[in-house]
C-alpha cells in the first residue's frame, strides 16, 4: 500500500529511487520491490514496497527491479503529476535499457 507523506503536486521536480531483489535464491526466490519519491531536499514524499512474485522461474532480481519502476510510474500517472522526474536505480540492466 502506497504511503503518502507529502503532496507531490507542490513540486515541479521529483527524484524516484527504485530497487528490487530476489531472495534467498535468484531465480526462484521471493521477488520484492520498493520505490520512494523524494523532493529536491531529500524529503520523502511517497513510498511503497511489496512482494511481486513468490517463487517460480519468473521470480528474479531483474523482474523485481522492473516491477519497482513500473509500479512507481503507474502510481505517479494516477496522481496526474507533471514535471521533471529523475530516476535512480542500482540495476545496471534497468539503467542501461531505460536510459
Predicted regions and their residues:
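RNase H-like nuclease fold core
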Residues: 2-63, 74-79
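RNase H catalytic domain
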Residues: 21-27, 69-99
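Loop-to-helix element that buttresses phosphate recognition and phosphoryl-transfer chemistry
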Residues: 64-68
